[in-house]
Design a protein with these regions (language model features):
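Non-catalytic DNA-recognition/assembly elements of restriction-modification systems
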Residues: 1-15
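A short glycine-rich beta-alpha junction/loop motif
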Residues: 73, 88-96, 127-152
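Amphipathic alpha-helical segments with low aromatic content
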Residues: 1-2, 142, 149-176
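Short, solvent-exposed loop/turn positions at domain surfaces
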Residues: 17-18, 58, 128
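Structural detector for helix-capping/boundary residues
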Residues: 4-7, 34, 116, 137
Length: 176
């Protein structure tokens, strides 16, 4: 196993749009941290939409890709999801986009981000203003541990994703 800073493990680290955008019916979704919960992106027809022109301005210099990790960094800090479909949606600044380098699988990195050690690092680095947040530079400095074997990363990542789904199912069952 190796340890390095999160920023050294990523080929891409950015947060969502900082601008204000007018609502537009039928346009691409503009989601925020509230839409990332329990490892998934949750949205419905009441969520904001922006014009295609605004969307293209936001993504003039980058694009989201399937497999990117979404991490909430403002408000509710530390929720994650892996982007399954990148078309027709973008995010406000409350969400960071993490794209692991080729030697780290997204599923494995998500498992690492969910560990109590990583979550404690997030907690200790957050700014305490009106709404708590973590700066990308501080996020990039958090140490992560990983195995260099992609096969081992895959097995670990799959195991914990299945376990997370099972826990979510049991939680839902308890609520009914």
């Amino acid at each position: 196993w190796e340890q390095r800073k999160l920023g050294e493990s990523l080929s891409f680290l950015k947060d969502g749009t900082h601008g204000t955008h007018a609502d537009a019916d039928g346009g691409p979704l503009l989601l925020s941290a509230k839409n990332i919960k329990d490892g998934t992106i949750k949205w419905d027809e009441t969520d904001r939409r922006i014009s295609q022109e605004e969307f293209e301005k936001i993504h003039a210099n980058f694009s989201l890709k399937t497999g990117d990790i979404l991490l909430t960094i403002v408000g509710s800090i530390g929720e994650i999801a892996i982007l399954k479909e990148s078309e027709g949606l973008t995010f406000q600044r409350s969400v960071a986009f993490l794209r692991p380098k080729e030697d780290i699988l997204s599923e494995f990195l998500c498992t690492e981000i969910q560990t109590p050690i990583f979550q404690k690092e997030l907690e200790s680095r957050k700014s305490t203003s009106a709404q708590p947040g973590i700066y990308l530079g501080d996020l990039a400095e958090i140490p992560v541990k990983y195995t260099i074997s992609l096969d081992e990363q895959n097995k670990i990542g799959e195991y914990f994703l299945k376990l997370d789904h099972l826990i979510t199912l049991h939680q839902r069952k308890c609520l009914t």
